[in-house]
Regions:
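Membrane-interfacial alpha-helical segments at the cytosolic side of multi-pass membrane proteins
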Residues: 99-115, 152-157, 176-189
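Interfacial helix-loop-helix junctions of multi-pass membrane proteins
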Residues: 82-83, 87-92, 137-180
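Cytoplasmic-side transmembrane-helix entry/capping segments in multi-pass membrane proteins
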Residues: 37-40, 59-71, 93-96
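Alpha-helical transmembrane segments of multi-pass membrane proteins
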Residues: 46-50, 71-76, 104, 135-143, ...
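N-terminal membrane topogenic signal
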Residues: 1-14
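Membrane-interface helix-boundary motifs at transmembrane edges
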Residues: 2-3, 31-33, 51-64, 118-124
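Membrane-interface helix caps and helix-loop-helix hairpins in membrane proteins
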Residues: 27-33, 58, 81-91
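Short, highly charged, low-complexity non-transmembrane loops/tails of multi-pass membrane proteins
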Residues: 193-218
C-alpha cells in the first residue's frame, strides 16, 4: 500500500510538470478562451478520484488513481495541449479503445457492488463478463450523445462535416472492442478464481477496488 501511494505521488508530480509545460506551449501558440479552459481542466481532473472518495465514502485505491491519471495525461495534456491528435495517427481512436477497458472495469465493479452478498464466485463468470461488456458499450453511446449535444453549440467533436457518421461509429466500435477484451479477461479471472494465474492490469485494478470498497463494505 505504501509503495503504491509513493508511486501515485510520483505520477502526480510528473503529471503536473507535464501539464504545466503543455499549458505554456498551448497558450503561447493560441491564448484563446477554449485553450485556457482546457488547461484549467487538465489541472483539475486529477482531483476527480479524491472527490469521489469523499462523496461516496470510498477508501483510496492508488492503482486506480495511477491508471486514471495516465489516461487523462494522454487525453488532455498530451492530446489537446501539446496537439498529440495532430502528430500521432489515430490517437483519438487509441484513446477511445483504452476508454473501453476503463469503462468495462467500472462495469465489473458496479456488478459486484449491486450483487447480493457481493462475493466473487466462479458462477458469476458469464453474467459479470456480459455486464462488463454491455457497460462499456453503454458508456461509448453516452459519450457520443454528449458529443452530439456539444455540437449543437457550434463545435464539431464528432467530425460530422468531414466524416459523416464515420468518426462516431469508429469511436463506438473501438470502445466496444476494448470492453470486449476486458470482459474476456473478467470471465477468465472468475472462472479460475483462487488459482495462481496472471490477472492482467484491468483485473488487478478491479481486485484492488473490490478489496478496499466492496468486500470490506458492511
Amino acid at each position: 500500500m505504501e509503495r503504491m501511494r509513493r508511486a501515485r505521488n510520483a505520477v502526480l508530480v510528473f503529471y503536473y510538470v507535464f501539464t504545466a509545460c503543455g499549458a505554456v506551449f498551448c497558450l503561447r501558440r493560441d491564448a484563446a478562451v477554449y485553450n485556457l479552459l482546457l488547461a484549467l481542466a487538465a489541472f483539475a481532473l486529477p482531483a476527480v478520484p479524491f472527490l469521489l472518495y469523499r462523496a461516496c465514502r470510498l477508501r483510496p485505491v492508488y492503482l486506480l488513481e495511477i491508471v486514471f491519471d495516465g489516461f487523462v495525461l494522454a487525453a488532455v495534456p498530451f492530446a489537446s495541449l501539446f496537439g498529440g491528435y495532430d502528430f500521432v495517427p489515430y490517437w483519438d481512436k487509441i484513446l477511445h479503445f483504452l476508454s473501453g477497458f476503463l469503462f468495462a472495469v467500472l462495469g465489473t465493479a458496479v456488478y459486484f457492488s449491486c450483487k447480493p452478498g457481493r462475493r466473487l464466485e466462479r458462477g458469476d463468470a458469464f453474467n459479470a463478463a456480459l455486464y462488463t461488456w454491455m457497460f462499456a458499450m453503454m458508456s461509448a453511446v453516452l459519450w457520443e450523445i454528449w458529443e452530439y449535444f456539444v455540437s449543437q453549440f457550434g463545435a464539431d467533436p464528432q467530425h460530422v462535416l468531414t466524416t459523416g457518421v464515420g468518426d462516431t461509429m469508429q469511436d463506438m466500435i473501438v470502445c466496444t472492442l476494448g470492453g470486449l477484451i476486458t470482459a474476456v479477461s473478467c470471465w477468465k479471472y472468475l472462472r479460475h478464481l483462487g488459482e495462481k494465474r496472471r490477472k492482467g492490469l484491468m483485473m488487478s485494478l478491479f481486485e484492488a477496488y473490490y478489496s478496499e470498497n466492496i468486500e470490506k463494505r458492511p
